Each structure stands twice: as structure tokens, then as C-alpha cells.
């Protein structure tokens, strides 16, 4: 994993990731080696989508 620009955000992002995974029905845990790339990508993609939407709503 690359070095975080804001290390304090790690816990919040982890919580956000688990929330999105739950909503999508993806069984995230401490070990995710048994998940497909599609499953992991759907969680990451949805996270990015929501973060962009949140940012865009702030700048309007």
C-alpha cells in the first residue's frame, strides 16, 4: 500500500470502505484474498464515485 497523504484519514476510509462493501453485498474482512477483482473494484469504484459527488456538492 502506498503512503497516505493524510494518515489520520485511514480509520475513516476503512470504515467508509466497509460501509460501501456492506451496501453492495461484498463480504469484506481483514483478509480479502478470496474476493474477485470485480468485487474489490466495485467497492473502490463506488467509494470514488461517492467522494467525487461529495466534493462536487461542496464546490457548487
Curated annotation (Swiss-Prot):
Keywords: DNA-binding, Sporulation. GO terms for biological process: DNA topological change; sporulation resulting in formation of a cellular spore. InterPro entries: SASP_alpha/beta-type, SASP_alpha/beta-type_CS, SASP_DNA-binding, SASP_sf_alpha/beta. SASP are degraded in the first minutes of spore germination and provide amino acids for both new protein synthesis and metabolism. The keyword Repeat does not apply. PROSITE patterns: SASP_1, SASP_2. Belongs to the alpha/beta-type SASP family. This is Small, acid-soluble spore protein 1. It comes from Clostridium perfringens (strain 13 / Type A). The lineage of its organism: Bacteria, Bacillati, Bacillota, Clostridia, Eubacteriales. The gene is ssp1.
